[in-house]
Amino acid sequence: MMQKSDQPALKQIAMVLLFDRRNRLLIYLRDDKPDIPFPNHWDFFGGHVEEGETPEGALIREVKEELGVELVDWRFFRTYVCTEGDAYPNVKYIYWAKVEKAPQELVLYEGQTLRSLTLDERANIRFANVLGAILEDFIAVGLWPRPVDNLPS
């Protein structure tokens, strides 16, 4: 028999490791405002799953709101239950996807700036919350796509 818990349900967050047409990871610099968690840190695209919404629905909505891109193809990576190391306890649904665009073809609607990141550049990045560890997990299982260097920037 299931017992009712006095604990509030964990907030749900859907995020995507989004790669550009050269297979570089697209990340954005969070605003530098003292009233937001992890100001001036680099972040993945995505956000909160709203009531009645699936994680996939939230992912599509958030990427459209933040980057103006309609995600049509994505893959699930992992679920993380984050009880520490973040602004509040949450469940993160992590996906990965690719957009066939160069960074300069994209418009960032939230945050300070957009960046495309190579595998080797990640060590110098200050990621928000537990995202650095999530990225390392993604790399460890061999999912970072091979670079495509024969395309114009």
Question: Can you annotate each of these PLM segments?
Answer:
Residues M2-L26:
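Conserved N-terminal beta-strand and adjoining loop/helix that marks the start
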Residues R24-R61, E65:
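Conserved Nudix-box catalytic region and its N-terminal flanking loop in Nudix hydrolases
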Residues K11, P39-F44, Y88-K92:
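Short connector loops at helix/strand junctions that flank enzyme active sites
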Residues W96, E105-F138:
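NUDIX/MutT-family hydrolases
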Residues E70-R78:
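A short coil-to-beta-strand element that immediately follows conserved catalytic motifs
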Residues D20-R22, Y80-Q104, D137:
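Active-site-adjacent beta-strand/loop module that shapes the phosphate/pyrophosphate-binding cleft
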Residues G132-S153:
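Charged phosphate-binding loop/patch that engages nucleotide di/tri-phosphates or the phosphate backbone
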